[in-house]
A protein has these predicted regions:
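Short secondary-structure capping/junction motifs at helix and strand boundaries
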Residues: 63-68, 80-92, 122-123
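Short, internal active-site loops enriched in acidic
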Residues: 94-99
């Protein structure tokens, strides 16, 4: 896992339970797919994902301490170093430990990139057999509450509740 500028073993990629993001949901992320192709492993729309990560971070007042080139290379290297040809990649920008409260002025910003093998999102049989769907009792969060184009950690609680509701 790439963590704050260097690669570390998965077991060593730890953060404090006092991370501001853990308490307040103040982080942003991307979900990126890499696929095996005729020309080797390709990462789907990588520049677009990196741009959105930076836009999301700006919307949440997270100052990423690296430029887009560094993050792009960390994403590519995460796939390569983990020997993955088809993968899910999760860059995450989050506040570390420090002062608590709703204004994390002096809290450090951390960045991680993890990549792992992940097959078909809805299962291997979904393409042939289809999937069951439902309408959740949970409503989408209003765009006046969260920036809808930003992938904010806290904003995904709504999606988690809807998924749990659908599965149950």
């Amino acid at each position: 896992i790439w963590l704050n500028g260097e690669f570390v073993n998965w077991d060593d990629a730890n953060i404090s339970v006092m991370s501001h993001t853990l308490h307040y949901g103040t982080g942003v992320f991307e979900g990126i797919r890499a696929r095996d192709s005729k020309i080797g492993t390709t990462i789907f729309r990588l520049p677009d994902h990196v741009d959105r990560l930076f836009d999301s971070a700006e919307a949440y007042n997270l100052k990423i301490p690296y430029d887009k080139e560094v993050i792009t290379n960390a994403i590519k290297d995460s796939v390569h170093l983990n020997n993955l040809s088809s993968a899910y990649i999760r860059p995450l920008v989050f506040f570390g430990e420090g002062e608590m409260g709703l204004l994390p002025k002096s809290v450090p910003v951390y960045v991680s990139v993890a990549a792992w093998n992940w097959g078909a999102y809805l299962g291997d049989d979904a393409g042939n057999q289809g999937v069951r769907v439902c309408i959740s009792k949970w409503k989408r969060i209003s765009p006046q509450s969260f920036k809808p184009t930003a992938k904010g950690v806290g904003g995904y609680m709504n999606s988690t509740l809807a998924k749990v509701d659908a599965v149950e």
